[in-house]
Structure formats: C-alpha cells, structure tokens
Regions:
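Electropositive, glycine-dotted interaction segments
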Residues: 1-124, 128, 134
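Switch/communication elements of ASCE P-loop NTPase nucleotide-binding domains
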Residues: 125, 135-272
Length: 272
C-alpha cells in the first residue's frame, strides 16, 4: 500500500537486477486488497496489461480469497436484536447471517426452504435451551416475514416478544449449525456468552464441540462458566486455550502446563 489512504502501489520486479516498474491504483480503504483485486484489474489498464499481475499475482490473491471465504467472524456486541425483532421484507438472497444478525429471519426462511432436515436439527437444538418449545416457523403476514415460536402450552410468540437471551440462542444456533456446501475453515465469535444463562452457555459449548460445519472455532470469552464445558476436550488436546494480556505476548496454555493446578477442577475454576 501507499503511505496515503485509498492508494495502492506495488513493484513488478521480482528478481534481483530486473527492471522495476511501480504500478499504482485506487483502493477502498475499508476493504482488503484480496476482496477488491478483480475490480482493480478491470479498472486499471496498466495493471491488467502486466502479465505478472494478471496471471501470477492474481492467481495467488484468488487462492487467498478462496481460503478466507471460509472464515466467518462475528462479535456479540454488534448483534442488533432490535432490528432482529422487526418483521422483514421477504428476500431469498441471503446466504449468510449478517454481522449484526439483522437478516436472521430471511436466512432462516431460506435454509428451511432448501433443507427440511436442517430445520429439524435447528429446532432440536433450540429445544435443548427451551425444553417446552414445540415448534418454530417463519410465516408471512401482510407481505412481511415473521419468525414465530410455539410452546407446549399453546402460546405463540414472535421475536418482538422474546427475551434477549432467546434471541442470542437463536443467533448462535444458526452460526454454529449453519448449513454449508463445504466445510468452513474457521468460525470466530467474540463473547458468545453475553446475555446467556450459565446453563445455556454449557449447551452452546457442546454445540461448538459437536458441530461438523467448520474445521476450527475461535472463541473469546470472559465467562468461567462457558470455559467449564471445554475441560474434557482440553485435557485430550482437542481444545486450545490462549491467554491475552496487555503488552504481553499471546500465550498458549496446554494441559501439561496446568495439570497439577487443574487437578479435578474445571477450566473455569482457574479464573473464578
């Protein structure tokens, strides 16, 4: 990149002694080069005219883009539950949950339309959190789409009536059990425990450890209760714990490092 925001530069010389030519282009400072490289090529004749850029560098960046396409990163603080509670215009274009989860109902409707088995799985997962839940559904009313929940008592609620914890459970259920044509490389969620009862945190932790929709899951948490559920897999080496402290290097903790201190305790006990 250049020293000015919105400008990019790179050299074409890749071997010692080779004549160098610096190519410059405009970039979107809020997006990575990988995601906008195709547009950069098409909008800059001088860059597209370089075989090195058009073939070698482009292929490398496309390979990187394909890899990072498998990354799903979400932050609990950005979930907009107020927006999620509102009826939505029916759309079938949303493949993934937005960063703010505002398109939850449309994504749910699309997934259930494409795969009835996924709907059954999603419903069963929610019943682990809410045992008296009988059925969930997305229904139309006045050309708007509404997500509804039916309880064993016969009471029905839409998302405007349920608690913040219930909304959070719905979001995490979708993220962790999202149907994919191919396995995701990484699912990252910042503080998934927010607004969740400790008992629900354990359920969500089990979802993460048993889901087959991603190769790795990265969780940042301040909750000892949430950590507890990962104790057994941590002992077996299937869960890694990293400690972040200001002005210190990130430290990975293994079971061997703390076996004596942990004893018969659970992971969360180290932070209580």
């Amino acid at each position: 990149h250049d020293d000015k925001i919105g400008k990019g530069r790179f050299s074409t010389a890749i071997r010692k002694g080779q004549k160098n030519r610096r190519l410059a282009f405009d970039v979107d400072s809020k997006e990575t080069i990988i995601m906008q490289f195709k547009d950069i090529l098409l909008n800059n004749k001088s860059i597209y005219g370089s075989e090195l850029v058009r073939v070698n560098i482009a292929q490398l960046l496309y390979d990187l883009q394909k890899y990072f396409d498998g990354f799903s990163v979400y932050t609990s603080a950005q979930f907009n539950t107020r927006k999620m509670r509102e009826p939505v215009t029916i759309k079938n274009l949303d493949d993934f949950l937005n960063y703010d989860a505002g398109n939850f109902t449309n994504v749910f409707n699309r997934y259930t339309s494409e795969d009835m088995l996924w709907r059954s799985l999603f419903e069963d997962r929610m019943k682990e959190l809410i045992p008296n839940l009988k059925m969930i559904d997305a229904a139309t009313a006045y050309d708007m789409l509404i997500f509804r929940m039916l309880y064993s008592s016969g009471e029905q609620y839409d998302l405007s009536d349920v608690s913040e914890g219930t909304l959070k459970g719905l979001i995490l259920n979708m993220l962790i059990n999202m149907p994919m044509n191919r396995e995701r490389a990484l699912l990252a969620i910042d503080e998934p425990e927010t607004n969740l009862h400790p008992a629900w945190q354990k359920v969500v932790g089990n979802w993460i450890q048993t889901a087959g929709t991603f190769k790795q899951c990265f969780i940042s948490t301040h909750s000892p209760d949430f950590l507890d559920v990962f104790t057994e897999e941590f002992i077996h080496g299937n869960v890694a714990v990293f400690v972040f402290r200001d002005k210190e290097k990130i430290k990975k903790i293994t079971y061997a490092d703390i076996a004596e201190d942990l004893g018969d305790w659970e992971l969360g006990d180290l932070y209580r």
